[in-house]
Amino acid sequence: MHLVRWLICLIQLWVQLGAAGSVTLLDPLLIEIPNGKLRGRDNGHYYSYEAIPYAEPPTGELRFEVPKPYKQQWTNTFDATQPPVLCMQWNQFINGTNKLLGVEDCLTVSVYRPKNSSRNNFPVVANLHGGAFMFGGPSQYGHENIMREGSVILVTIGYRLGPLGFVSTGDADLSGNFGLKDQRLALLWIKQNIASFGGEPENILVVGHSAGGASVHLQMLREDFSKLAKAAISFSGNALDPWVIQQGLRGRAFELGRIVGCGQASDSGTLKKCLKSKPAIEIVSAVRSFLVFSYVPFTPFGPAIESPDAPEAFITQHPIDIIKSGKFSQVPWAVTYTTEDGGYNAALLLEKQASSGRELIVDLNDRWFDWAPYLLFYRDSMTTIKDMDDYSRKLRQEYLGDRRFSVESYWDVQRMFTDLLFKNSVTVSVDLHRKYGKSPVYAFVYDNPSEVGVGQILSGRNDVYFGTVHGDDVFLIFNVSFVPANRRPDEEIISRNFIKMLEYFALSTDDTMAYGDCVFQNNVGSKHMQLLSITRDGCENKQLNCFI
């Protein structure tokens, strides 16, 4: 009799735990969410549940529309053992003339949960991948490093890219920002479902690198973001970078229509209807027509300021105006850069041309006034050619003086790219948030060059010193294929410190943030910029006199 009662109590306990959303005790690979049951994969030291749809496929009549939550009910167990596919894209890092990758039906999330841990539940890191809003994918930022530490659940997100994600005519008919709206729906899915995987919905940290970092910032500028996440980190990208908020998108939208055979469209509604009828491959392949040379500009299609009457508009004001209004989510935020972030995309200037055998940077001596507005993203922000030429001349004089563009002067060209595309906006965004926000604002700079990074990949060269370029920090958190697996001892330490930093920030009960032995200093209420410097030798808090 006592045995029967004990068994009944045990069964009731299992039922209660299952109802509470915990991972099934009898089979941790079998997870139940509102759509039904799904089965993941055992990877030794972690479990993975990949390519779970969070939105209806954005195809057919749902192309160029606000994403719709995935409602299908599974009659059989969903197979979550296959890696996510890439959203269709024209990828910069593919050699050759055909850079097309991916498919249109791609709106999925993937969940990675540590195994063999003393914890039953984990804080959550949701990652928005980078790629200039044009390319990349959730699998681009590998999960092995984070899973090795066994301290957080990682969720990666696929979202629409390039023209499929960001074409816009600036009005309600074709408003744009579909990729950002995808991200937001995915974050809502995480909030509602992560407990079923052993995640803590009250401890969600949203992070992103480059365009992912800018996406994090843009998500944070919505007042309802605080309902989806506890804190946020933008690595080497924020909403104030000049390549983020696009101008001239209406003209590009109609030019896209002309390229794919919608040239007869005279209004946004007609253009949208025509574009919906065209093969996605044709639309994405048209990206090549918007590149001046190589992959420049690297973001021909990106976030837009939408019309207030657009359906479910994402942002209707410039980020600066949103911050000044104070109407954004008050969650702790960290923003970062690397000392030579401009190695992307300055490094491609060192690539030797097959026709002449000389580097592209040499051609800048004759093409600077033509190319600079595209390289540094002021082509659409200035009204006259004279304004552009005057600014181009000023930049060249400030960074090069009377020297010519050459391999020998590359370092100063890269410094220009770092300042204008990444570093300067960190200072401005921190300054604005400390003035008009209430929640903590943190910043750090990373200075520790990797052996192989974006500089070497884009230039195809190992004979040039690039410094600490774009991604050298984040690629110690999320492993990528082109970074050597045999990292230096200092990089192993930094990798662990970074991952612990994410865990600390997600779990923090007082909104503080720490890296190793260094506690970040809050910029809110400070007269000087508080910046944590991270190097191979450790970390140090610094004060910079750079606020206005």
Swiss-Prot record:
Changing residue 546 to F: In strain: GB139E and JR50E. Its main location: secreted. Its EC number is 3.1.1.1. The gene is Est-5A. GO terms for cellular component: extracellular region. GO terms for molecular function: carboxylesterase activity. It comes from the Eukaryota. Changing residue 260 to L: In strain: GB336E. This is Esterase-5A. It comes from Drosophila pseudoobscura pseudoobscura (Fruit fly).
